[in-house]
């Protein structure tokens, strides 16, 4: 804000400063306060009003009545391209498709229509493309210029010899293409797919081949960087399953690497059973493809043993004997382990073995990196840094995060690079180091720009928004995360390694909105998922989240049950950081005998952990905290004794007689116990002291 204010107050020296943003976020108030000094151009300013339409008509040499101009505005919403179309049609109004149909489509001959359909899958058209996509004889000699002269909503760049159809026109033409008879429609999609494939635009090549029902066309593409993509309503995982099941085996044999890449997509989409079936079948198809592809198969089949590092290492050892050069399957464009940005979430599978796993992971990935030219570079350092972080060893964690960043950048391992940014941000938030958090965010944004091969891809978007969204979740500012990470993002049907962490942020969003029941339902359903997705790290996070949710709804018994599970996992490796973030909320549960007796040492360590995480307290997640005092200390032996007798149904006088103390002393002990336990009535004692 200060920089913006300084720029606004600069002397008038002819320098124009332009801010372009889809969403100004927290700067909106700053710009609104500077309204008199800043010239705004909003989306609404680009629409034409009734008087603008009349002026537009006059510039074209015509006139309109106020009624005609008003009808055009109502029909088009003031969208300039649509208004221009209405004026070309002599003021006719109606739905956009209707206008386009009447204005030019019905006036085109069959050849011109076919030519436009063949070009409708491109937003930039060159003469070379026309020669390749439109068969000879479709247009008469010199018909190209006539075609575009008669077609509205096409911008021509004469110098560069390019045509740019407007989105309105493309939408209309693609709807006409969908209505075209099957053979011609498929042939149009097939030719477009070939052009996209030959020009290295794989995403659109696959889309076109899929619509053309051309499985060999799909297999002929370089199927890289497609995790998370959708083709119409079909996910890439579903597409992979369809192609592997229906494409003739004699065709599949010609594309061994593509078969393995489709199997990789199956595992990435968590279709574990289908992955196992197809890998068994493909092993036989690869028998005559040479040792290298059998080595690639062994590399990929290591996923069948995940998260068993010994099993994975044995598969890598088998691959090492077969591969003749670096892997073609595991390359930077396919981020390590489907773009998951947390190695701790992936590989922490057995409580009590967290640091042992770090050592074993280093050994296994050393072999893997030899075979893949450093595909997992930085992953082992990231895991170790995350392990230190959950133990509260933040300085050591930062060192590991920086090492992960340096190593992963050299090998272009985006998963570890983005994971390092996430870890540095988490550590900064836990220490209330906002300058450190800003450095982590800046680092993330710089890396997002430098990994050009991820730009514009679904997996790239998932990875960046995972880091950004997770940090915003810890900051209790989920409303600033990407829209697709909000709303119904807690659904489980599309849960994968790639998007798991961003979906956990949705739980924070639900807590902030006090939708505790929905959060409980989502988390408890997640616990029943495949253990490859729900690791020990994820399970501990979920147990802690359920304890918070039940605590928020006042169900202290259920909250204690889930906190007990969380502490049982956490104390085996002393990974207390996340629980410590909410220790203020958990103080009432820490006092319960069922918790204090089992986890006394863990509770003392959690209270002593050097975490200065203020966001949870400032956000006031739980309505129940609004009216209760903060817990200061545990119950004394006498307070516990009095409270337990009261919970058993005794009156104050009966307690006094039993313990041989005065009734006023009983009242004093109960008052202290109520304050320490965050309760205001005796009925809660039964649940708290069980």
Language model regions located:
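Linker/hinge segments immediately adjacent to helix-turn-helix/homeobox DNA-binding domains
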Residues: 89-97, 499-525, 529-539, 544-637, ...
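Alpha-helical sensor/transducer elements of the RecA-like P-loop NTPase core
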Residues: 2-71, 75, 81-86, 168-172
């Amino acid at each position: 804000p200060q920089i913006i204010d300084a720029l606004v107050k600069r002397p008038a020296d002819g320098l124009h400063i332009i801010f372009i943003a889809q969403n100004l976020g927290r700067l909106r108030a700053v710009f609104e306060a500077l309204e008199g000094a800043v010239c705004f151009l909003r989306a609404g300013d680009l629409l034409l009003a009734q008087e603008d339409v009349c002026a537009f008509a006059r510039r074209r040499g015509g006139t309109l009545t106020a009624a005609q101009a008003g009808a055009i505005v109502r029909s088009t919403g003031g969208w300039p391209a649509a208004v221009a179309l209405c004026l070309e049609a002599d003021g006719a109004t109606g739905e956009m498709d209707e206008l386009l149909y009447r204005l030019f489509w019905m006036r085109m001959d069959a050849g011109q229509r076919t030519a436009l359909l063949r070009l409708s899958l491109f937003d930039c058209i060159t003469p070379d493309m026309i020669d390749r996509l439109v068969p000879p004889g479709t247009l008469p000699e010199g018909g190209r210029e006539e075609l575009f002269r008669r077609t509205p909503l096409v911008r021509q760049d004469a110098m560069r010899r390019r045509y740019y159809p407007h989105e309105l026109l493309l939408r209309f033409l693609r709807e006409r293409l969908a209505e075209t008879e099957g053979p011609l429609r498929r042939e149009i999609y097939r030719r477009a797919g070939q052009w996209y494939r030959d020009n290295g635009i794989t995403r659109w090549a696959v889309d076109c081949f899929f619509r053309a029902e051309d499985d060999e066309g799909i297999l002929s593409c370089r199927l890289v960087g497609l995790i998370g993509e959708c083709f119409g309503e079909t996910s890439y995982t579903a597409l992979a399953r369809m192609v592997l099941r229906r494409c003739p085996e004699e065709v599949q044999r010609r594309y061994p690497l593509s078969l393995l890449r489709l199997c990789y997509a199956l595992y990435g989409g968590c279709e574990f059973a289908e992955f196992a079936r197809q890998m068994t079948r493909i092993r036989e198809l690869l028998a005559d493809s040479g040792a290298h592809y059998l080595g690639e198969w062994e590399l990929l089949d290591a996923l069948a043993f995940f998260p068993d590092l010994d099993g994975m290492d044995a598969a890598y050892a088998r691959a090492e004997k077969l591969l003749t050069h670096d892997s073609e399957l595991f390359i930077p464009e396919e981020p390590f382990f489907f773009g998951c940005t947390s190695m701790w979430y992936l590989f922490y599978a057995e409580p009590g073995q967290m640091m042992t796993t770090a050592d074993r992971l280093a050994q296994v990935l050393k072999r893997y990196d030899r075979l893949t030219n450093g595909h997992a570079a930085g992953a082992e350092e990231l895991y170790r840094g995350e392990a230190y972080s959950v133990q509260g060893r933040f300085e050591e964690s930062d060192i590991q995060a920086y090492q992960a960043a340096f190593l992963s950048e050299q090998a272009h391992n985006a998963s570890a690079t983005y994971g390092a940014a996430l870890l540095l941000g988490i550590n900064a938030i836990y220490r209330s180091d906002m300058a450190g958090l800003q450095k982590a965010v800046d680092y993330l944004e710089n890396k997002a720009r430098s990994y050009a091969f991820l730009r514009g891809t679904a997996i790239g978007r998932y990875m960046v928004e995972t880091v950004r969204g997770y940090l915003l979740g810890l900051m209790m500012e989920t409303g600033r995360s990407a829209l697709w990470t909000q709303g119904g993002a807690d659904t489980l049907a599309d849960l994968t390694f790639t998007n798991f962490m961003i979906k956990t942020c949705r739980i924070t969003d639900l807590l902030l909105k006090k939708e505790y029941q929905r959060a409980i339902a989502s988390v408890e359903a997640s616990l029943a998922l495949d253990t490859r997705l729900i690791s020990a790290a994820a399970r501990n996070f979920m147990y802690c989240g359920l304890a918070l949710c039940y605590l928020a709804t006042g169900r202290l018994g259920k909250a204690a049950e889930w906190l007990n599970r969380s502490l049982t996992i956490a104390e085996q490796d002393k990974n207390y950081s996340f629980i410590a973030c909410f220790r203020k909320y958990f103080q009432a549960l820490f006092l319960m005998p069922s918790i204090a007796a089992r986890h006394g040492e863990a509770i003392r360590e959690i209270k002593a952990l050097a975490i200065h995480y203020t966001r949870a307290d400032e956000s006031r997640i739980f309505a129940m905290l609004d009216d209760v005092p903060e817990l200061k200390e545990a119950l004394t032996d006498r307070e516990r004794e009095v409270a337990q007798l009261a919970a058993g149904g005794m009156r104050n006088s009966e307690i006094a007689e039993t313990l041989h103390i005065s009734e006023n002393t009983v009242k004093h002990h109960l008052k202290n116990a109520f304050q320490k336990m965050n309760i205001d009535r005796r009925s809660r004692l039964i649940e708290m002291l069980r």
